């Protein structure tokens, strides 16, 4: 059987660099090397691209994935010939890319656009869904147009805030009240997010969030259970069972997600069949409103009255040992190794479908 030459793309110039390394390590452990040739492609924290030797055997430490040596790093402008050759005749050709990148410069449509220009199959969402899914303000605007119920929100640009901070704080207090959540608009993994109960905490949260992005979003607090569902597919997506996150802290922050695992995951979540159906329905609506492909994880709040509010969609959920997405599919009957193989199949399917498009008149 001919092996699929799989390029694992990980690292990235992002605050979520370490998360990406953890995701890559988990994927490598799960991939069947009888079916796949694994070719690591590392993006350093400085944005340099390095292609390593084919992975054979076991990798046990994320540090082994940090390929060093500036002499081997190149500019993305040379990718098509030096890092990711896709011509079938080339010995180092790559059949499909699996981007395991999180945050800006990876999950936001930039890398997806590069791979589109190179006309190479890649796992996951395209340029539109990736960019819209990364920007919480754009995403919420799209969800509003799709008729999805969500928390009230307000967005702010750093330059305007610097000119009139009082106006920004007053807008939050008048429109949203306390408590509220302040978040960078273009970052995931709960980086830079703070829950604010008063003006002092709000001011501090604005300062921190603007360190990570030029645009931030502030959302009203919805009192409810945090539930999530996985979506898998292309034109006909399907949903996993619904899971629940029960953080021991005030909310599900970066440390709870990736460092100490100080959170309980309940899969499947206890709820009525009607509540589960509404969550799955809205997850599909969100996926299709973004023109999703491959996968998303949709996050919701479920109130004690049974009201469902969509929080956000993650277009590249993590695959770490604590990650909800693979666990949801495991409990749905799709084990992690098979999940990854299905994502690769979907990537190839989508690429073949796009080759049918006519570009000349």
Swiss-Prot record:
Protein residues bound to Mg(2+) 1: 299, 312
Record domain ATP-grasp: where: 140-345
Reactions accelerated catalytically: 2 D-alanine + ATP = D-alanyl-D-alanine + ADP + phosphate + H(+)
Function: Cell wall formation.
Location (main, coarse): cytoplasm
Keyword Cytoplasm annotated: yes
One Gene Ontology cellular component: cytosol
InterPro entries: ATP-grasp, ATP_grasp_subdomain_1, D-Ala_lig_Van_CS, D_ala_D_ala, Dala_Dala_lig_C, Dala_Dala_lig_N, PreATP-grasp_dom_sf
EC top class, as a word: ligase
Binding of ATP, residues: 173-228
GO BP of this protein: cell wall organization; peptidoglycan biosynthetic process; regulation of cell shape
Record flagged with keyword Ligase: yes
Organism expressing this protein natively: Bacillus cereus (strain ATCC 14579 / DSM 31 / CCUG 7414 / JCM 2152 / NBRC 15305 / NCIMB 9373 / NCTC 2599 / NRRL B-3711)
Pathway(s): Cell wall biogenesis; peptidoglycan biosynthesis
Protein name: D-alanine--D-alanine ligase B
Cofactor(s) it depends on: Mg(2+); Mn(2+)
